[in-house]
């Protein structure tokens, strides 16, 4: 995705690794930053150097759907999906992981999809890009169960693959 957009002169692509916090059992959090896992050719922008108000990005792509709901790790609240959504015309969520295709008849696997599907990043995003048609159907079904039958069309429209 980065290569596709960064070579197109119509786009200005900014890659901003977010600092994150490991949550301790006592409720405190330890600050951490991971900039070493990016290829050298990717120009990184520090979140301290970036202003959403000045940049007014057309699109923001996120990979972390959890916001404050992850029990072990979080980012600063200013980077939660609901806050990013107000700074862009289109918030796009692309899961950072690939999963096996899930058979809805496998109740254990289906049950645990709630841990990554019904999360704020998918809910607040204007567009969700799933890995396949089957995973899109899974997202639509799970989110419709969570929010009610009247929401099904919304999920069908905003989730793609």
Where are the predicted features?
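Active-site and donor-binding regions of nucleotide-sugar-utilizing enzymes
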Residues: 1-157, 161
